Amino acid sequence: MGLFIETSGRGPEVVLIHGWGMHGGIWSGFVPWLTDRFRVTRIDLPGHGHSPMLADWSLETVAGAVLEAVPRPAHWVGWSLGAMVALEAARMAPGAVASLTLLCGTPRFVAEPGWPGMEAVTLMRFADGFLSDYEDACRRFLALQAWGMPNERELLRGVRSQLSGRPPPERPALLAGLEVLRHADLRGVLRELPQPVQALLGRRDRLVPVELGDALARLKTGLVSHRIDDAPHVPFLTHGERTARLIHEFIASS
């Protein structure tokens, strides 16, 4: 199947993977921070934006479809659910993923004893809003992320414009992605990956707690972890320059 992709810039290949319920347009305001140094590919995951749905939507089939669509090798940046897709792709095709940035992402989304994450009940409450009224839940989610930012209104207008330009995700894709968030456990995959890995976390993130950085560092030898002050779950939108600089520096050192 052919997934919808957009490519811009020149230089080493970078692939951006969006999160649950979104599409590649979410990166539009962030891409210019990268294209002076990198050739950036954005993709709509199956059933999101302009990409068709997969008959069998699973972490493995989605990662496989993305691998078929993007340049190889590339430095992958996975945001939220996109981090899980990137981890699975790195497991399936190590030579295709030169390095991996987990951007407010985690190998295990749901909290467990000794593992920071979102409580399962909270995740289901959050997801129910998107499943019952996607547009309203999306507005509320983005407003929460932008709250308190100096350019709050401008930021919200820009992001809403970027998201409204493509169809909303298909319900089966939302449900399948939710199952991945609830049940996937890629900690063993992360532990064994040969590629360089960094984690970028926001101190105001209410979905992926900033405390995860310490757990990731214990899990993966050599993992680089950065905490972005005042950043919510979307630091590439609220702190684009800082996020891009950390990606630049990490890739340069990989």
UniProtKB/Swiss-Prot annotation:
| Compartment list | Cytoplasm
- Give binding positions for substrate: 20, 80-81, 141-145, 233
Under catalytic activity, the entry for this protein gives:
6-carboxyhexanoyl-[ACP] methyl ester + H2O = 6-carboxyhexanoyl-[ACP] + methanol + H(+)
Task: List the EC numbers from the record.
Answer: 3.1.1.85
Q: Cite the active-site annotation.
A: 80 (nucleophile), 205, 233
Q: What is its main location?
A: cytoplasm
Organism's domain of life?
Answer: Bacteria
Keyword presence, Ion transport: no
Please name the Pfam families in this protein's record: Abhydrolase_6 (PF12697)
Q: In which pathway does it act?
A: Cofactor biosynthesis; biotin biosynthesis
Offer an example of a GO molecular function term for this protein: pimelyl-[acyl-carrier protein] methyl ester esterase activity
Q: Which residues form the signal peptide?
A: none
Q: What Gene Ontology cellular component terms go with this record?
A: cytoplasm; membrane
The reply on keyword Nucleus is no
| Any one of the GO BP annotations | biotin biosynthetic process
* NCBIfam families named among the record's database cross-references: bioH
Name the job this protein performs: The physiological role of BioH is to remove the methyl group introduced by BioC when the pimeloyl moiety is complete. It allows to synthesize pimeloyl-ACP via the fatty acid synthetic pathway through the hydrolysis of the ester bonds of pimeloyl-ACP esters.
Family per similarity comment: Belongs to the AB hydrolase superfamily. Carboxylesterase BioH family.
Tell me the protein's name. Answer: Pimeloyl-[acyl-carrier protein] methyl ester esterase
Task: Please tell me the species this chain comes from.
Answer: Methylococcus capsulatus (strain ATCC 33009 / NCIMB 11132 / Bath)
Phylogenetic classification of the source organism? Bacteria, Pseudomonadati, Pseudomonadota, Gammaproteobacteria, Methylococcales
